[in-house]
Every structure is written in structure tokens, then in C-alpha cells.
Amino acid sequence: DSKEHGGVGCRTRKQFLFDDVKEQFEKIMGKKITKWRETYSICGVFQYGTAGIPKVYHVDAQQYAAMVFLTPNAPYQAGTKIVANKKNGIYHSSQGNPLEYFPQQETFTDGTLFEDVDVFGNVYNRCVIFDGKAIHTAGDYFGHDINSGRLWQMFFFDAE
């Protein structure tokens, strides 16, 4: 069961948070999670995207994002990227007004405005935790359905 949302692809309505996920994130990061599933309704949902879906360049409202890549043998370039604006070098929302690097709605999908800072390859069952306030996007989408496309579980949270 998936729903319409602000992202691309299909996303589950239900949150799937397995035992000790929050505690494991806290242990890995050495921080206490202060806002989790109760605050962020998309924490713990599954999502997939397929070839032809545009990449969306964005920052999150949440402090941290995490994703677990769930497609076996996926192309490595189909992971997630932290990017910087080519014109002004901004790669994090703390460096200026987000409207300076997203001046018009159509620039959210215009990859020519950005260059890669960090690339997290799509490795099956790998969890990547990153600063949600950094400008980021998916790598390449691939496949034609949930069985052959880019599948991941995502988490959003704040911590101190």
C-alpha cells in the first residue's frame, strides 16, 4: 500500500520500525534521538523508484536521514549523493537561505546546477546515516517495478 507524497516513487503508508532500530542508531552515532516516529510520520517507511523518475535535489526538515538499501545487486551509482551548488558552493542549509540554491521550483530536478560532494553507493542491506540538512539526491533510479527498481527503507530523526 503506497501513497502520494512530496517525494518521487511509491512509499508505504505504514511505518515499519523493528526492535532496537532507534537504540542501534543512538549507539552508532553516540547521540540520543530526541524526535523519532512520533514526530516524523515517514520515519521507517519503505519506498521504491524506477528508471525514468527524475532525481529531486533537496534538504530535509529533519536533522538526520538514514536509509537502508534493499535491492540486491543494485548499481552502485544508484545510492545517495550529497551535492553542492556549482555557482556558490553551498552544500548545507546552514550556509545560507535555501532559496538561494533553489530559486525556482523547477530547479529541484535540475542536476546541472550541482556537483557531487559525497557519494554513498547502493550496497545491499547497507545503512547510511547522514546530515539531512545537506543538499542531497538519489543516485540513478533503475528497473521498472518494485522487484527490479531502487528499494530502500528510510528513517528521519533529530538527536542531541
PLM-predicted stretches and their roles:
Residues 1-55, 79, 86:
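Non-heme Fe(II)/2-oxoglutarate
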Residues 49-160:
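Catalytic core of non-heme Fe(II) oxygenases with the double-stranded beta-helix
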